[in-house]
Structure formats: structure tokens, C-alpha cells
Amino acid sequence: MRYSELADLYRRLEKTTLKTLKTKFVADFLKKTPDELLEIVPYLILGKVFPDWDERELGVGEKLLIKAVSMATGVPEKEIEDSVRDTGDLGESVALAIKKKKQKSFFSQPLTIKRVYDTFVKIAEAQGEGSQDRKMKYLANLFMDAEPEEGKYLARTVLGTMRTGVAEGILRDAIAEAFRVKPELVERAYMLTSDFGYVAKIAKLEGNEGLSKVRIQIGKPIRPMLAQNAASVKDALIEMGGEAAFEIKYDGARVQVHKDGDKVIVYSRRLENVTRSIPEVIEAIKAALKPEKAIVEGELVAVGENGRPRPFQYVLRRFRRKYNIDEMIEKIPLELNLFDVMFVDGESLIETKFIDRRNKLEEIVKESEKIKLAEQLITKKVEEAEAFYRRALELGHEGLMAKRLDSIYEPGNRGKKWLKIKPTMENLDLVIIGAEWGEGRRAHLLGSFLVAAYDPHSGEFLPVGKVGSGFTDEDLVEFTKMLKPYIVRQEGKFVEIEPKFVIEVTYQEIQKSPKYKSGFALRFPRYVALREDKSPEEADTIERVAELYELQERFKAKK
């Protein structure tokens, strides 16, 4: 199958904003995709090469890409760099460079999807001395044989800046439409395996029956079950039917642990493989988990010298560190607090009641200095739960989780079986959807960011304010570099940005406002932190903003 067919799909997807049309385009493409390509094409459609949980990365930045294009086309690097400044899109500039290429090689071959994918695998696996040169040559060979439009989308895939507007929901519906299977079965299979390639192949070859038989697999992370918010401990108890398991809500990074004999893999909340960054935790897990095979879930917390938890950003610093890890082990010690188990020695436990899963967890974990069970209180009494809540806050934790004793584990679902209880005017996690260029010495930097809450019903991101304070000069440099590849359009000083990044924002209060489509505006919003552990769809919802507004107004009325 030729790569030009995939490039044409990208072009058509880019031209429409209609989700129904995007779904149809993707479904039609999947129908004609050969079986042997069906496990890789869904990722390429998403603008990726590998699933998020796959450790492999291309490791190619703009500079190396420009060198490869220059080598392939004969267009000087400086000319390509100048073109990028004009177009604002390296993909467009690559297409222009290929158009300028004097002639094709006598041995030129049309690009196929298999060749492109196999080359990407070689690039990802190139390690050690001379690996950058090898990566550049592999890329140059692709660009030598690429047509301008193919080159544009190759470059965007390499840099992860596809801009076609296809996310997981569209791909899920397209798989269902293409192979005439139930969307809910596609969703279920994906939630259990986080692997669209595998799900697409099962859907085509085995249909609804095959999808319904999909099971948890060690080495493929399960989408985490999520919680809704509760206004108070009392409200949580009422919602739970009068009795609940309350657990400390740790201020850390949620992780999923897969153990298979001596092999342990740890995935972050966004399902990225973070195993290499936490070797001391891996060794502690091997000693603590008794079964041969298991999947458990917990919160990884950074511990300060006084034994109190440090902000979760410290854990993210550990995840990002690729070198001098031993130094970081000493600087930022970690502790894993386990709170759930989904799989033990061939048996899936997701249909098992929470109370029984917790009992199983206690049975299979040998606690140690680094591996502990999440502290828990099962009670019917509001006073007991409130005392536990106060204690959690005094210890420096975020609050409490409340869980129904009979709740099954529902991958990817944000329901009321689990509730989180935190102080009323908590910070919000919001998505950057726009920004403005600064003035004077900051004219080359983005300096004010339009942030939005997620509307799960429409899939839209609804703006709730502009955040311009709380950033250091270094933050603005980093944010500009990070966001530039995702600029969709510019109007004067304002740029629209593809929703990719979540930031934590504090504020004085929430106001009703006709200024924004959401109907709300944050008063005096201030940047707190980048939430690299959250995807845009995991940001706070517009319902949560409305809930906080109501709580705030009730609190004012009591004064």
C-alpha cells in the first residue's frame, strides 16, 4: 500500500472540521488497509508511530530533520530554516524543499507504508555512537523518494505535529464503522489493552465475538478508572449508600505496575513507560509483589527529608531524567502507595468487587519502606471520615478518595463509584487553546495563555480565561518552544493552539461571564505548574467549573 494514499487521507482530514466526515474518511481507509498493515496504520493515522506505552521513540528534533531534508534535496539548511520562519510549519517547508529538488534518483522507488514504518523502527532503534548520523541517513532516504505532500506528512509524523484533528474517539468510531462492529465493544477492547492496532485487527478478523473475548494482557496498560468530585465527606457517604472505603488521596503520580516473573514495567497515568527512570522502585516492587504475574495500581509519591510528601512535580522530574539517575534517587526518594489490583496469575479481577480486590491486594503485597498499601478507613460514620480527611490534609496530602465497596473496576470510566474529596477552592487543570505574543523584549515569546475546560459531551474545550502571571522568563521560553509546533493559525498577536498541554491554574474566584462560550471566567488566574501527567481529555470539565462556582456562591451566602 503506497504512502501517497495515507498522505491523501491526511490532506482530506485536515480540510474538514466535521467529525462525522473525519470518521468516514478514516473508516474508508481502514476498510482497504491490508491485514498485515492493520496493526500499524491506526497509529500513523493518529500521527504516531508507536503506542504511548511503547518505550521506543524516534528521537529526532527539528535540526536533525532539516539536515536530512537538506541532504535529500540539495536545498541549503539555512534556506529551509528561513522557509520555516515564513510558513510557521516545518511540514510545509519540507514540501517546498522537495519541490525545488533538481531531479529524482534513477533508482527512486515510490514510498510504501511498510517501508516508511520499517524506516521509523530503524530510526527509533538506532543507539550509541554515530546513531544521529544513521538516523539522518535513514530519514534522507525517505525524503529522496518522497513527493512534496508525502514529505510534508512524514516531517509532521516525525515531530509529532500532525494537526489532522483525529483523536481516539474518531478512531474508535471509524474502526466500528469500517468493520461493522459495536462501538462499545471497540471501546471496551481498547480500554483493556490501550492498543488500537490490535483492536482494529481483531475487529476485522473476528468481529463482535472476537472483541468481546479481549482480555487484559501484561505489557499492555489498562486505561485507569477515574473519579468524580464530591463536595464533602458527607455527600460522598450519601452517594456511596451510607458506607464507603475512604483512602488518602496522595499528591503524587498515578502509576500502573505490570509484573511478569522478574520483569517489571511501570506505566504513568498517560500510559508512558517510565520503568528506566525509577530503578530503585522496580527492585522494591520485585521484592514486595508475591505473585508471579500481577497488575497493580498506586500513587508514586516524592518524600521530603521530614517524611512529608513533596509536590507531584518532583515525581515528574524523576520520570523525565534519562541520565545520572543514581543522583536523582538520592535527591528525590520515592514511595509507592498501592491501592488496587486488576490481575493476578492469569485471573482478571476487574469484575471483582472493590472490597475483595483490596483484600487480595493486602494478601499479595509485602509492605516495605518503599512499597506501602494506601491508608484506608471503611466507615459509615461522617465524623470518623471527616477526622480521617483532616488528618490527610494535615499530613500534606491532597484529600481523600471514597470508593463503593461493591464497585467493579471500570477502565477509562469517570463515574460516581469513586469520588475525590478535596478542599473547596481547589486549583483547576486546564488546557491551553491559544496564546498572545508578548511586547517589547518579550515580543518573540508567547506571554498570555487562553485556557479551557473540557466538555465531555461535545468534545470541545471551552475557554474560561487568560493566564499571564506566575510564569518565570524561563517558563515563557520553554512554553514558546513547546507550543510553537502546535500553532494552528494566527490573527494579529493572537495564535490558536491545538489542545495538547494541560496546566494547573490557581485563581481568586470564578465569575459568570458572557465573554467566553463557557459562560465562566476565572478572576486573577495564575500559573502553578505544567501537568505533563494529564492528557487534554483528563483536564477539569466545564461541569467541575460550574460545581466550584456553585460551592463558592453557597460559601459566600453563608458569610
Swiss-Prot record:
InterPro entries xref list: ATP-dep_DNA_ligase, DNA_ligae_ATP-dep_bac/arc, DNA_ligase_ATP-dep, DNA_ligase_ATP-dep_C, DNA_ligase_ATP-dep_cent, DNA_ligase_ATP-dep_CS, DNA_ligase_ATP-dep_N, DNA_ligase_N_sf
Active site (UniProt): K249 (n6-amp-lysine intermediate)
Coiled coil: none
Cofactors (names): Mg(2+)
Summary of pH dependence: Optimum pH is 8.0.
Subunit structure: Monomer.
Protein name stated in the entry: DNA ligase
Taxonomic source organism: Thermococcus kodakarensis (strain ATCC BAA-918 / JCM 12380 / KOD1)
The organism's taxonomic lineage, starting at the top: Archaea, Methanobacteriati, Methanobacteriota, Thermococci, Thermococcales
Designated gene of the protein: lig
